[in-house]
Amino acid sequence: MAETSLLEAGASAASTAAALENLQVEASCSVCLEYLKEPVIIECGHNFCKACITRWWEDLERDFPCPVCRKTSRYRSLRPNRQLGSMVEIAKQLQAVKRKIRDESLCPQHHEALSLFCYEDQEAVCLICAISHTHRAHTVVPLDDATQEYKEKLQKCLEPLEQKLQEITRCKSSEEKKPGELKRLVESRRQQILREFEELHRRLDEEQQVLLSRLEEEEQDILQRLRENAAHLGDKRRDLAHLAAEVEGKCLQSGFEMLKDVKSTLEKNIPRKFGGSLSTICPRDHKALLGLVKEINRCEKVKTMEVTSVSIELEKNFSNFPRQYFALRKILKQLIADVTLDPETAHPNLVLSEDRKSVKFVETRLRDLPDTPRRFTFYPCVLATEGFTSGRHYWEVEVGDKTHWAVGVCRDSVSRKGELTPLPETGYWRVRLWNGDKYAATTTPFTPLHIKVKPKRVGIFLDYEAGTLSFYNVTDRSHIYTFTDTFTEKLWPLFYPGIRAGRKNAAPLTIRPPTDWE
């Protein structure tokens, strides 16, 4: 077989060489025996170099013979043969290639063409090498066959490279589109932020108007009491001034006249003004009267202190107003959902705390529970007592050092019996932890989450109308992941405490009030 291959290779090489040699002959001038230069054709059909045939006929005036066939023509007729000129150029190029191949493809030992390929030594050899002792027992095939075989092998290697190239091309195309997508996302987020703050401003304006209205009402109330108090004090002052003038007049009287009706004078003024009874007071002398006047002045001072009392009341009313940030806190508090766990949905292996804020997994069921339509019987989870069909809601779940858990929401129509795959397509939007350090959003396929700081507490924010469910690491106040979808059913907060794996995952999941609002 090797000999047959050698013969076939030799025949193929000889045939190629003969064809090239014939082309060189046809492209040569019969006069100068070189490649035709500016080839021209004469009447008999032969071709020559223009310069050669011109010199050949130089001394002739008629009967111009052909240098090849000797046929004569009456006229010096030379027609350029441009097509032949192109073939001459091709022949020159082929000869140059042949020369280069011959120089590069010669056996260094025998100086013969390397026309064969040895499989054992994986090298090109010449005919002499192939029949020599070195390669006699080897498998030798024509170089063209080996070339074709290895081309096919390389083609197979090329296929995955082309696939990878296409993948990179698609990736590059995708990356080139991302700036535009990013611009759209940024604009969408910008509009969302503007809407959020417009809503916040609206709420703040409403709260501001309420507070200003309360302040104005409080001001008017205090002013009214101040006016009433001022009028009351004016009346008291006039009465006291009248009494003082009367007493002063008595003091100017003689002793008998002064003491004659002082008792009636004092009793008709002082009890009516101050509510006290002086029927038992019998001033004996001028010194006693002066003591009464001093007492009257002291009472006047006590009454005028009501101004100070109103002022303190004013301060007290102002201190009852919210602090500058109270309105914002009040608005934010409206987003906080009071989430409690629903025992009617709890898997039989789950135990809830008395306040229905904590849930943990137990391996042995403590009691038999009725298999109601709302209860999960395969997936060990529990839902909240209240679901959401609109609005924005926020709650936090303490996960502590647990090694396995999942939190999120599910729609009302999810399957609660039998085996299920909790994915968005089946109505579940969750973030989970398993094996202690593997976090993922349960998309299709799962989206790995690279969390730098292990969360002790997870915050969940649902914006029903916007179709977003966001998760936050409360421990370092970082964003974990956001689902974007279209919500069409009631959504229920979902809690999966994970299968108990020793003491590490024995702790419960606990719903906690947000840290900033405790």
From Swiss-Prot:
The reaction(s) this protein catalyses: S-ubiquitinyl-[E2 ubiquitin-conjugating enzyme]-L-cysteine + [acceptor protein]-L-lysine = [E2 ubiquitin-conjugating enzyme]-L-cysteine + N(6)-ubiquitinyl-[acceptor protein]-L-lysine
Kindly provide the PTM information from the record.
Answer: Autoubiquitinated.
**What GO CC annotations are associated with the protein?**
cytoplasm; cytosol; mitochondrion; nucleus
Zinc finger spans (B box-type) are: 102-143
Cite the SMART domains for this sequence: BBOX, PRY, RING, SPRY
Documented EC number(s): 2.3.2.27
Q: Where does Zn(2+) bind?
A: 107, 110, 129, 135
Q: Which cysteines are joined by disulfide bonds?
A: none
Pathway entry: Protein modification; protein ubiquitination
What range(s) does the B30.2/SPRY domain occupy?
Answer: 319-514
Q: Where are the zinc fingers (RING-type)?
A: 29-70
Assigned protein family: Belongs to the TRIM/RBCC family.
Q: What is this protein called?
A: E3 ubiquitin-protein ligase TRIM39
State the organism of origin: Homo sapiens (Human)
Which taxonomic lineage is given here? Eukaryota, Metazoa, Chordata, Craniata, Vertebrata
